[in-house]
Every structure is written in structure tokens, then in C-alpha cells.
Amino acid sequence: MLKNRSVVSIEDVDIDDLNDLFDLSDSMLKTIEKGGSTDLLRNRIMATLFYEPSTRTRLSFESAMHRLGGSVITVSDVKTSSVAKGETLADTIRMASSYSDIIVIRHPLEGAARLASKFANKPVINAGDGSGQHPTQTILDLYTIKRETGSIDGKTITMVGDLRYGRTIHSLIIALSRFDVRINLVSPQILKLPEYVLTKIGDRSRIMEYDDLSKVIEDTDVLYVTRIQKERFSDQNEYQSVIGSYSVDRDLVSRMKKDAIIMHPLPRIDEIKPEVDELPQARYFKQAYYGVPVRMALIYRILGD
């Protein structure tokens, strides 16, 4: 059960929680598609603290809370807040706890969300911590796979791009290890998946690593593409050496299964060409759309009766 619990890692959400969230997300989606909202969390307040830029994640969290009947307080720019005066993360979290019922935090430092949960007396949701994890993105990614393909089990899932710094990849691989799937990892050598992520996966025999996407594209059921995380590189020459390593275009998609899907956590740069957007395999905008009902489900399970 998730009631009154923080979610800072996908490991904080077990398989029963996931299945429950999928079912509840279906209900929340129906509410949205009918043009409605609820008053399930009337008089409850969410505090959003985003120390890094965000569009989809921030908007979907705030939209989710409003659709649940709650309200949102936020720091629009941490550079103009007390953080700019030297206030510690611990003190900021203590103050946010006193003003709200739940805290959503995005921070550039890996482990910041876990630290925040130690100082908060209210539940904390990790909206991304550096190159660590992004658990709510993973929940909506799993929901997208299930809803768009019918099931998660039995699929071959190919992840391509920045596997080293891509926090959505880290969380998703850990979560997928609970399902009966095969995983292909495609990246340049310097952007391979970190060993610490692999150590969290029990059976590695279902995971294969490649540097050539064309070798696995025809057997792929779900192609999960990520941008190269420019902001995580300390050496820009290293970044320049890998930019544009992979590109999904119409020709590549023509080799995919007709019922395969393409996902991307967004924003994209040049790793998926605009010409792919209208193809039936493209589901990344639908994936982003599911962010609101999935986050509604999670917030309600944490704060609701």
C-alpha cells in the first residue's frame, strides 16, 4: 500500500502497487476524457520544488493535483527563492512540509529526493534526481506499454540512446526486471548502462547490449528512445563525440513490426525525426498524455482515503 508513503525510487512501488495504479489510471483517464475533474483531494495542497527545468513532468503533476480537486503551491524559480540566499535543501523541505500535504521535487543531484524524504514529515515524490531515477515516468511508461500493446510480459524492449545518464532508463530497467521481457540496450560505449543499475537486476540473461540499432530493430516490440543528456556531461568534447549517434527515421521504422510502438520520455532533440510523428508506431505523445491520469492515480493512492 502506498498511503502516506514517499516514492523516491521505483523500488518503493511493488508489483501489486503497479497493477493497482494501472487500474486506477484507467479510471482517471475516463474522468479526463469526459472533460471532468473530481473533488477526491479537496483542501489538500501539493508543493512542487523544481531545481531543474521541466515542462511535461511539472505540468502533469500540477494538472493531476488540480483535477483531483486539490491545489498547488510552487517555487517558480529557485534562483529567486531562499535557495539563492544559501538555504539548505533540508530547511527548504522542512518549510515546504509545513505548508503542504505532499511534496514533488526535481533536483540535479542524484540522491536529493531520498535526502528530502528524510527531512520531510509529509510524503515526497521524486520527479527526477540528476542521473538517478524518475519513478513516476517509469510508472507511466509501463502503463503506456500495457495499454498500447495489451501486456508487458512477452515483449522485446529495445532502449537506445543515453543509457548512462538517462534516469528514465535506470528506473524503467529496474521495473522491467519484474516482468517476463527481453531487453536490448543500444548505446555508444561511453553511454552504456551503469553497473550499479545492473546490480539491481536479478537475471541478466534477458539483457543484451549492442552498439548497432539495426541489428535488433526487426525483433523489437517497444522501441524506447532517449536524448543524449547534454547537461550531464562535464566534458563537452565527449558530448560532441556522441551527439547524433542514433536517429529514428521513416526508413528505420519501415523495418519494425507493424504493431510495434515507439516511445520517448521527451523532450527530443534530433533522435526521432519529425517525419516519424504521423506513423502508426509513434506513441510518444500519447505516452506524455498518460502522465496526468497516472500521476492522479499515484497522488490519490498516497493522500486519499
Swiss-Prot record:
PROSITE patterns reported for this sequence: CARBAMOYLTRANSFERASE
One GO biological process term: 'de novo' UMP biosynthetic process
A Pfam family matched in the record: OTCace
Catalysed reactions, semicolon-separated: carbamoyl phosphate + L-aspartate = N-carbamoyl-L-aspartate + phosphate + H(+)
Keywords: Pyrimidine biosynthesis, Transferase
Single GO term (MF): amino acid binding
Binding site for L-aspartate: 85, 167, 227
Chain positions recorded as carbamoyl phosphate binding sites: 56-57, 106, 134, 137, 266-267
EC number in record: 2.1.3.2
Enzyme category, top tier: transferase
Pathway(s) it belongs to: Pyrimidine metabolism; UMP biosynthesis via de novo pathway; (S)-dihydroorotate from bicarbonate: step 2/3
Similarity comment: Belongs to the aspartate/ornithine carbamoyltransferase superfamily. ATCase family.
Functional note: Catalyzes the condensation of carbamoyl phosphate and aspartate to form carbamoyl aspartate and inorganic phosphate, the committed step in the de novo pyrimidine nucleotide biosynthesis pathway.
Quaternary context: Heterooligomer of catalytic and regulatory chains.
Protein name per its UniProtKB record: Aspartate carbamoyltransferase catalytic subunit
Source species: Thermoplasma acidophilum (strain ATCC 25905 / DSM 1728 / JCM 9062 / NBRC 15155 / AMRC-C165)
Protein's gene: pyrB
